[in-house]
Amino acid sequence: MQLDWTFHFGLDVWLEAKRPTALRYHVRMGLHITDIAVSDFRNYERFALGELGNLTILVGRNGVGKTNLLEAVQLVTSAGSFRHPQIIQLIREGAENARIQMETTDGNRRITTALALEAGKRRYTVNGKAKAAADVRGTLPAVVFTPDDLQLAKKSSSVKRQALDELGAQLTRNYHVVLADYEKTLRYKNRLLKDEASRDLIAAIDETLVTCGSQLFCYRVALFTRMMPQLQRIYTDISNEGEAFAATYLPSWDHVAGIQPSLGGTAECLAGTPIEMRENGAPDRDQVRELLADSLARFAEEEARRHRSLLGPHNDKIAFYLAGRDASAFASQGQQRSIVLAWKLAEVEMVRQTLGANPVLLLDDVMSELDETRRDTLVNFASDDIQTFITATDLTAFNPTLLERARIIQL
């Protein structure tokens, strides 16, 4: 599949044109969730919330189902879940199917989006008309913050890549398509390597891998280079330490060859082999194709020896640095939390800048994990124009001023 490079930021006309006509206007104007109902979903037989405002706090003991409701919101708004479950896990034990229905409005008209889950299948409808998941994904992007995210600064590059890819998939449909194509091709290649297939067969698969891999690399790097200044600025605003923050993206063809990133003027962008960047902020795809193809040929014997694919965007490295030191090894717990908080707020900014509308913010039991300063930063950022859902076991970590403007639901 050959795609023109158009995933550059600021081309709102292109983003609108690629979105389904029935949903295009509403994304531009911004959507607000007014009602949500679930049946036979997770632990809920029936549950509904109506007349939802900008801030909803779900309070209850562990295991009561608070997180399940956030997951329901994300499944409908983003066509995905931060838990990455199998469909059978979403259906209440003893039931044959489950349903989530959400009402949204842009201020002029109401939209009903529903998700039916049964027998390993999921079916979306918008105002009663069947839609593919790709048509629903990103119509109301969701930014999710869970306790697991607090380890983002210390965890491996795979977690950081996944976070970028999940954001990118909500910003443009092409990102998700290219990512899915690449992952499918990669799985096939790894099976061939494991089965010790012929060099000619693997070389043929590498041609497809180069096509979709170079596209994914360009999409991800464009998003990374656009997001990093936001992340850097927000981290500086919320950090009390005054240390310089930087991030690097090191392509697989460099780190597999033993090339190390060098911090400098472009430390928040690409590290390693210089890559030409076009005016739209995208890497030169022809150069990326050439680099990836050459690297695959150069490391073909090593991949065959290890029985796994070493080269491609699935093995690119992303690292955070504080004062020039690797944050995964040297950052304090407080610094790690500041990095993750800055990352999540930068995600919100990217949705705003790219789609011209606010996301829905889903905060799963993170208020008690943050100190007062970071809680206030998060709450102040999630101002009245960002619809926010928060879960908590109790309200002790909440500012009284925040509680005054919240709808509190005891589960």
Could you describe each region identified by the protein language model?
Residues W5, P20-R61, R199-V360, E369-T373, ...:
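Conserved NTPase motor "head" modules and their coupling/switch loops across ABC/AAA+ ATPases, GTPases
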Residues K66:
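Conserved lysine of the Walker
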Residues Q74-V159, A163-Y175, M228-T236, V288, ...:
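Nucleotide-state sensing region of NTPase/ATPase domains
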Residues Q151-L152, S158-A203, E207-V210:
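Long, charged N-terminal accessory/stalk domains
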Residues D364-V366:
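Walker B catalytic acidic pair
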Residues Q387-T393:
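Structural recognition of the conserved hydrophobic beta-strand(s) that form the central parallel beta-sheet
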Residues L402-L411:
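A short helix-turn-beta junction within AAA+ P-loop NTPase domains corresponding to the substrate/partner-engaging
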